[in-house]
Each structure stands twice: as C-alpha cells, then as structure tokens.
C-alpha cells in the first residue's frame, strides 16, 4: 500500500524535472521567410563550415568529440558522423600525411590540414593508409616538391620498349644483329611507334630479317612491320601480347614553347629505360638546316641527350604526353625529334590507306604554325608583319605547284580553310588529304584575300 502511495509522487517529480530540462534549452528561432546573407556571421571555424538549420548561413561545424543531434546543435563537420549524441570520425584507421606525421584517423589529418592552410597556405594530404614508414623524410622538402622528372618517368617507362632487328643467316642459322633502338606502345593490343631506320636495314646480305621487341617487364615478342615511311622516318610495328599493354598518349607539339622541360627515354647501347632530360631549344627547326635536302619537316630541337639506341623512343612533356620521337643527334646538347603532330598525320594517312583507296595529295607549300615566338621573330625582320595570333605561315611555295598556280606567295598567312579557322599546320594538312578543293583565306600585309586551290594527287 505504501509503495502504491509513493508512485504518483515519483511520477510527478520526474515530470517536473523533464519540464525544467526543456525550459533550460532555448526554443529554436523560426527560419526567416527570406535569407539575408548580409546578416550572417563570419566565424573562424577550426572544424570547418556547415549550413545552419535554416540552410541560409554558414556556421561552425561541430568538431570531433562535441555533442550533436539536439535541435540547436551544429551538424558534425566533414568526415564526422553523429554517434550516440557525439561527433565521431567515420574512419578509425591511422593515416600518414604528406608532412611525414602519422595521424590517429582521417579526421585528425583534415583538422591539421585546415590549421596548416591558415598558417602556411600548404595543405596536408593523405599519403597512405596506416602509419608513416620509419625514416620518412618531410614530403614538403625540395626533394619531394620538385622531383617532377621522377614522376614523369614512373608514368611513361612501362610503355617504352627495346627493339632489335636481326638477320637470320641462311647457312649457319644464327641471328646477326643489324640495328637496335626504342619505341613506345600506342595501343593496348600491341601497336608500337618507332623510327623507320630502326626497323629497316640497307644491308645487302641474304637472309630473313626478324624484329624482336622486349617490354619493360622482360616479356619478348616477335614483331612485324605494319606501316613505314622512310622519308618521314616513322614506322609502326605490331606485336601480339597475351594481355593488355600500358600505352602513351600523343600530345600537341604545336603547343611547345622554347625553354619547356622535356624527358627523353630509350635504350641507348641496349641499356633499357635510360632517361635524359633537357629543354626545348626550338619547336620548328627546318630539316634543310640539318642538311636534309628533301625534308619537308620541322624538327623539335632539344638539349636532352639522344644516343645510338635512343632512336624511336619518346620525347615527352611533363604531363607524360609524347610530343616527339627521338631521331637525330648532331652534337652534344643538340638533338632532334620528329614532332607528335607529324606522327598523328602519319597514323591518320595510313589508317585512311587501309580503309579506302588512298591517294596522297599536296598543294606545294612549306609552312610553319603561327606562334607568339614566330611572330616576334618575323616582326624583328619585318616591322610591317601583320599582328596575327593564329594561322599558318607560308615559308616557301614550291615552283609549278597548285599553290603557286593558285596565287599563294612566300610570306602569306593562311588563316582559314573552307571557312574554318586554322590553329596549326596539321589542320591544313588534314584538309589537303580529305577535301577535293580548298578555299584559303590569306592575310597578305594588311589585305585579306581568297584563293581557290585544287590539291594535286601524287600516285
């Protein structure tokens, strides 16, 4: 009986305490009908920012260990979640930061990164899951910040191959080495680009020639020549791998600037994956300046060392894109590469040749892509040279060619073909190959002229 009498009194006390607890927590203010961001506070938040309850202003997020879940509590910050009324990190494993320190979890690293941003402007990023290895250097040191060449090599090396050309002696059955060089993989199925002189020989000895390709991982394959252009010194060969291969992508050599860093990689003296670095001396060195009388190509000149065996290997920019094929060394510090835009043209021409009755066309000009450095050079020689930012500079018109007969002159600037603006020479070359007639818009001095040119078919 006595217990029953005490029960109503106990319930009354509990109800009173609940009311007092609710009274201590101020009621949430109603959200305004219109959000006025000018009235939002500008707090400094070590835990980051989150939208407020009305989704109007940014307020400080609750940090790890702070209460959450109640009507007036701020949402938990980035990578945190509300667990039993307290903000906890979603991940519990330790991580290694780029500052060389081990953090208890991802959230602790992110908090340190926000503090570092406020102090030095350099964030701390996650390097790996788990503790930092012993003896790890500060990853913000110059060795780690400026080792960009190592990053490029790590990216491109698996797609660079060593190529050897042998002659199978008909009597003794021995392989007689004829040449060796490098190449790079262009397709996962085994298409490789190299120099024509690496995979062909002028040897008059009798016997069957064989091509052997060795990958970075040591796998070796017999290769066959798919397409070859000895004048341009470009060739493609094919292997049949057992699995997909790493590949390199072609960059845009017309965008190269003098002074730009480049990396050359190849197999000089059969020493695979030998790396040299340098800068672009000029992106358009006329082949005739190198004593190549029949050349219609502008080469990339670099001081990256290219030796015997480097031929056919890639010259890449710091993005790991192929911007040339290592081809020729004149002297120490003076080497040359075939531009990637010419490789693209070669691949396109031979693809067309395989899919249709293909005929080569030409209009008879030697040309250079307009670049700021070229305009500066031409203005120095001729102050009246027009101020142009893009187009094709006609360096020379071949006598009795379609261009000469159509009225094109040395020094003209071709700005459009069939109404399309020209950004580089490859676009004009593509139009010559694929279109039966060309309407060229030309800038000559201060005059804009139109010329109709019919490309000539070369059998």
Swiss-Prot record:
Highest level of isoform 1 in maternal part of the placenta, moderate level in heart, testis and ovary, low level in muscle and lung. High expression found in granulosa cells of the ovary. Expressed in bone matrix, particularly in articular chondrocytes. Very low level of isoform 2 expressed in placenta. Expressed in the bone matrix, particularly in articular chondrocytes. It is found in: Secreted. Residues 181-347 are annotated as: Serine protease. Transmembrane segments: none annotated. It is an enzyme of class 3 (hydrolase). Its main location: secreted. Residues 76-134 form the Kazal-like domain. Pfam families: IGFBP, Kazal_2, PDZ_2, Trypsin_2. Induction: Up-regulated during early pregnancy coinciding with placentation. Also up-regulated in joint cartilage affected by arthritis. Residues 365-450 form the PDZ domain. GO terms for molecular function: identical protein binding; serine-type endopeptidase activity; serine-type peptidase activity. Disulfide bonds join 31-54, 35-56, 40-57, 45-60, 68-82, 76-87, 89-107, 96-132. Residues 1-23 form the signal peptide. One of its GO terms (biological process) is negative regulation of transforming growth factor beta receptor signaling pathway. InterPro entries: Growth_fac_rcpt_cys_sf, IGFBP-like, Kazal_dom, Kazal_dom_sf, PDZ, PDZ_sf, Peptidase_S1_PA, Peptidase_S1C. Residues 27-90 form the IGFBP N-terminal domain. Homotrimer. Interacts with MYH9. Interacts with TGFB1; the interaction inhibits TGFB-mediated signaling. Interacts with BMP4; the interaction inhibits BMP4-mediated signaling. Interacts with TGFB2 and GDF5. Serine protease that cleaves beta-casein/CSN2 as well as several extracellular matrix (ECM) proteoglycans such as decorin/DCN, biglycan/BGN and fibronectin/FN1. Inhibits signaling mediated by TGF-beta family proteins possibly indirectly by degradation of these ECM proteoglycans. May act as a tumor suppressor. Negatively regulates, in vitro, trophoblast invasion during placental development and may be involved in the development of the placenta in vivo. May also have a role in ovarian development, granulosa cell differentiation and luteinization. Belongs to the peptidase S1C family. This is Serine protease HTRA3. It comes from Mus musculus. The lineage of its organism: Eukaryota, Metazoa, Chordata, Craniata, Vertebrata. The gene is Htra3.
């Amino acid at each position: 009986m006595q217990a029953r009498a005490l029960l109503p009194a106990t319930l009354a006390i509990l109800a009173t305490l609940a009311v007092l607890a609710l009274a201590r927590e101020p009621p949430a203010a109603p959200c305004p009908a219109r959000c006025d961001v000018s009235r939002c506070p500008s707090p400094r938040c070590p835990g980051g920012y989150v939208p407020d309850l009305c989704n109007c202003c940014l307020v400080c997020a609750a940090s790890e260990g702070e209460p959450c879940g109640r009507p007036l509590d701020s949402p938990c910050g980035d990578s945190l979640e509300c667990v039993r009324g307290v903000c906890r990190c979603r991940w519990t494993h330790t991580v290694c930061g780029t500052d060389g320190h081990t953090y208890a979890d991802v959230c602790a690293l992110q908090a340190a990164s926000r503090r570092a941003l406020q102090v030095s402007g350099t964030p701390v990023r996650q390097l790996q899951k788990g503790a930092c290895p012993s003896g790890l250097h500060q990853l913000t040191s110059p060795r780690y910040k400026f080792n960009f060449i190592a990053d490029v090599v790590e990216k491109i090396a698996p797609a660079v191959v060593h190529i050897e050309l042998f002659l199978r002696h008909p009597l003794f059955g021995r392989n007689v080495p004829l040449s060796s060089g490098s190449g790079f993989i262009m397709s996962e199925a085994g298409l490789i680009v190299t120099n024509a002189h690496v995979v062909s020989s002028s040897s008059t000895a009798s016997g069957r020639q064989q091509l052997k390709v060795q990958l970075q991982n040591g796998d070796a394959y017999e290769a066959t020549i798919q397409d070859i252009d000895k004048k341009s010194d470009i060739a493609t060969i094919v292997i049949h791998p057992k699995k997909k291969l790493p590949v390199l992508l072609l960059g845009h050599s017309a965008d190269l600037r003098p002074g730009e860093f480049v990396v050359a990689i190849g197999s000089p003296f059969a020493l695979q994956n030998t790396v040299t670095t340098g800068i672009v001396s000029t992106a358009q060195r006329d082949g005739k300046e190198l004593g190549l009388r029949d050349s219609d190509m502008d080469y990339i000149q670099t001081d990256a060392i290219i030796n015997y065996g480097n031929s056919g290997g890639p010259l890449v920019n710091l993005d790991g894109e192929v911007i040339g094929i290592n081809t020729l060394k004149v002297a120490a510090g003076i080497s040359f590469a075939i531009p990637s835009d010419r490789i693209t043209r070669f691949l396109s021409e031979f693809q067309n040749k395989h899919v249709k009755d293909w005929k080569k066309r030409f209009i008879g000009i030697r040309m250079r892509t307009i670049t700021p450095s070229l305009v500066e050079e031409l203005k120095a020689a001729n102050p009246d040279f027009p101020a142009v930012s893009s187009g094709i500079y006609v360096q020379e018109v071949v006598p009795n060619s379609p261009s000469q007969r159509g009225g094109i002159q040395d020094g003209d600037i071709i700005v459009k073909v069939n109404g399309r603006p020209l950004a580089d020479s490859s676009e004009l070359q593509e139009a010559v190959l694929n279109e039966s007639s060309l309407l060229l818009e030309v800038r000559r001095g201060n005059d804009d002229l139109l010329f109709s040119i019919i490309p000539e078919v070369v059998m």
